[in-house]
Amino acid sequence: MRVYIAHNGCLEAEPIYGTICELVAQRKMSVITDPHARNNESARNTDSGVVSLNQAGRNKYLDQETTSRSINVPFCAGISIGGDGTFLRMARDLKNTGTPLFGVNMGRMGFLVDIEPEDIVNLVENIVKGEYTEEKRLPITASVQRGGKKIHDEWAVNEITIERKVEGKVVDIEVFVDGCRVMDISCNGIIIATATGSTAYSFSSGGPIVWPEMKVTLVVPVSPHELFAKPIVLPDNRSILLKVTSRDNKVVLCSDGQVRLCLQSGDEIACHVGKVPVVFGRVKKGCFAEHLVKKFNLQTA
């Protein structure tokens, strides 16, 4: 059995990282760490758990190329140590594998990660015994066409966005749904979000919160310069096409907050719901409404 561990590289996360590695090794499982953790020298050299794993030959620090090859071999679980950003990076590393993903919260909010550091022993036990539930979340994908040729494919858990590259500039975008133009706007950007991503960038830009099991896609303009450019909620089987009409090329394509590609005027971005779900592992019971109240510190009394 193999466990994939993603580490945010912060000093506060190192003891948790070492403890999880040691717990996993004690149960005769091997550990694969992401390149971000591999490049953290203090994480490699100061944690006794990590050193003993190296000596035992069960802990492998891999470069990106080796990591990609290792992903082809199944993992029993993926564990991130950090905030939502670390969890999303792990999800990208393990995309299309069906690996159950767990997150230990070392961030400020950690909406996607629900394991506290003091619960890591129970977490490893739950993984070993298979005592957890799985939530299957559909990702969003995008294909970029330039001059009639596909130049890039993208994938995200939360959202894919088109944004301005330079402050003070606006982005001109046409939005088509099933071939029908529904928006022609100037804005700071536009968000194509999943139900999972409805509590992230989409929410901060005025989009609605939707329950993660809902099969919908959100189209949310960011600071639009039109009076009636409002968020749209679509069934997840709709075809969404974005066309960049900005006269300059100060536009970028981002996925889950990371810049992936510089766009040009005339580029077309076709967005679809992914076919292979992202599997969220859950060891805690609770409903989504309770999670909202806790994470957003909502005043309910």
Swiss-Prot record:
GO terms for cellular component: cytoplasm. One of its GO terms (molecular function) is ATP binding. The keyword Kinase applies. Its cofactor is a divalent metal cation. GO terms for biological process: NAD metabolic process; NADP biosynthetic process. The active site is at residue 84. It is an enzyme of class 2 (transferase). Belongs to the NAD kinase family. This is NAD kinase. The gene is nadK.
